[in-house]
């Protein structure tokens, strides 16, 4: 079949001018003018998309087939161009019949041209073909304009949908022209309004927690390298205060909250035998909130130890991608869940602004991943925000997934961020050793975002930096009071 693009070439119809006219008409539409005025940072991203629009229109012209009637008329015209005047006169009745058959706009004019001239001269032959070609050019141009107008309407509809989406998410995710451009690129997917409202919802929550946004920016833009002990470094004296509780019964000095089973109050011990309160007992045991006797004799003393001399390097480090692990255990539900999701959204904003990748992994009984800065990043973010935190805590699997990803070529300079309350089992020795190897040999940095003041120190000791955001009621009230 004859395509419209081929017909344009045959008749020397200037399709580039028609395409440019469509693009300029689209840019001059009132909708785009109002959008550019409201969101000036996205204007450059939209104008950078113009080559893609032009390519789309060219591709549409190449793929569109010419109607069968016009194809038949064009083939007849091409055959007539090769005929001499006597041969053309012989074929003229069949030509006029074909023009009537295909309902050509030139049919009436052709018959009039023949009937008005008794003698068919070579000049009349040339005039007949010239006017026929002009009719074909008009038909082709009209077909081009009709097709491009349909494409313009479709393109305008697509752009309006993307403008609506981008306008809604601009305040949440756009920090500079880099992020504006990437947001516009990601808006090309088929996203429903009700879906992306979830991002707007967590963006509003993030706006109510400015400390969380500030924490994400500090973590995302921290370039300071960690202290690394040099090989064969000299030892230095290191003094720490160590608390040593009394190990023998002494005089009771009062009550305190701790996890000392040997000094429990009888009332606390009684709850262990009640099925309905057993879970509450273990929770308070983990959080060191059980009421116990406080004995005299507990004291602090100075412990002296030796450690290698370390040198703190303050050179700026290159910014690599984020690998963010989010704890989805039951203890991370409620307000913790909101904070964790909003924090990931804030890291996505930083990653878009700095042209970095941001990969989210949820860990409970299994590990699920979402790349928020990919081409389908908005859909990935919506899926992530739709998850519910109701699983268990398998932080070891989380670290193994991080280690495996860091060993890939695309993530060689990644920063790992673990968001959790860190109320979990201790890490296996092989995982700890592998993490320390990555920190020491490849300068990978591991960040902890602690959502609780009761995280296990043994787990958190492995991180280069601990960013604390206590979600307890007291801390929330203090933060609100300070604003």
Curated annotation (Swiss-Prot):
Pfam family, one: VWA_CoxE
Gene Ontology terms: cellular component: cytosol
Keywords, comma-separated and alphabetical: Chaperone, Cytoplasm
CDD domains registered for this protein in UniProt: VWA_YIEM_type
Compartments it resides in: Cytoplasm
Major location category of this protein: cytoplasm
Origin: domain of life: Bacteria
PANTHER family: PROTEIN VIAA
NCBIfam families in alphabetical order: PRK10997.1
Chain's role: Component of the RavA-ViaA chaperone complex, which may act on the membrane to optimize the function of some of the respiratory chains. ViaA stimulates the ATPase activity of RavA.
HAMAP family (alphabetical): ViaA
Family per similarity comment: Belongs to the ViaA family.
Identification of the protein by name: Regulatory protein ViaA
Gene that specifies this protein: viaA
């Amino acid at each position: 079949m004859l395509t419209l693009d081929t017909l344009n070439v045959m008749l020397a119809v200037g399709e580039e001018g028609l395409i440019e006219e469509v693009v300029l008409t689209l840019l001059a539409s009132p909708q785009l003018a109002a959008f550019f005025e409201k969101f000036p940072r996205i204007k450059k991203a939209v104008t950078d998309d113009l080559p893609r629009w032009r390519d789309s229109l060219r591709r549409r012209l190449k793929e569109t087939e010419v109607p069968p009637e016009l194809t038949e008329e064009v083939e007849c015209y091409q055959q007539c161009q090769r005929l001499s005047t006597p041969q053309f006169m012989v074929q003229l009745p069949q030509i006029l019949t074909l023009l009537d058959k295909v309902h050509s706009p030139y049919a009436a004019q052709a018959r009039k041209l023949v009937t008005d001239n008794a003698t068919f001269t070579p000049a009349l032959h040339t005039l007949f073909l010239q006017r026929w070609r002009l009719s074909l050019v008009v038909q082709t141009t009209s077909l081009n304009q009709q097709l491009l107008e349909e494409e313009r309407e479709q393109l305008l509809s697509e752009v309006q949908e993307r403008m609506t989406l981008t306008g809604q998410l601009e305040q949440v995710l756009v920090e500079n022209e880099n992020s504006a451009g990437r947001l516009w690129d990601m808006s090309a997917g088929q996203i429903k309004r009700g879906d992306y409202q979830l991002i707007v919802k967590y963006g509003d929550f993030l706006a109510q927690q400015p400390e969380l946004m500030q924490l994400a920016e500090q973590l995302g833009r921290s370039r300071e390298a960690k202290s690394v002990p040099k090989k064969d470094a000299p030892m230095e004296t290191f003094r720490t205060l160590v608390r040593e509780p009394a190990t023998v019964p002494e005089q009771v000095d009062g009550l305190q909250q701790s996890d000392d089973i040997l000094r429990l109050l009888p009332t606390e011990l009684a709850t262990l035998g009640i099925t309905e309160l057993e879970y509450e007992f273990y929770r308070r045991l983990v959080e060191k909130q059980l009421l116990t006797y406080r004995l005299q004799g507990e004291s602090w003393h100075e412990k002296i130890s030796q450690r290698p001399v370390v040198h703190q390097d303050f050179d700026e480090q290159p910014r690599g991608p984020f690998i963010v692990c989010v704890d989805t255990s039951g203890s991370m539900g409620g307000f913790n869940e909101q904070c964790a999701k909003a924090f990931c959204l804030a890291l996505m904003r930083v990653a878009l602004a700095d042209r970095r990748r941001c990969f989210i992994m949820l860990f409970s009984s299994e590990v699920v991943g979402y790349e928020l800065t990919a081409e389908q990043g908005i859909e990935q973010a919506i899926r992530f925000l739709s998850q519910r935190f109701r699983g268990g805590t398998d932080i070891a699997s989380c670290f193994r997934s991080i280690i495996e990803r860091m060993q890939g070529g695309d993530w060689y300079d990644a920063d790992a961020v673990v968001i959790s309350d860190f109320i979990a089992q201790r890490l296996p020795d092989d995982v700890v050793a592998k993490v320390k190897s990555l920190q020491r040999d490849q300068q990978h940095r591991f960040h902890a975002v602690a959502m609780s003041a009761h995280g296990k120190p043994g787990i958190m000791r492995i991180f280069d930096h601990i960013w604390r955001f206590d979600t307890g009621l007291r801390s929330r009230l203090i933060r609100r009071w300070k604003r």
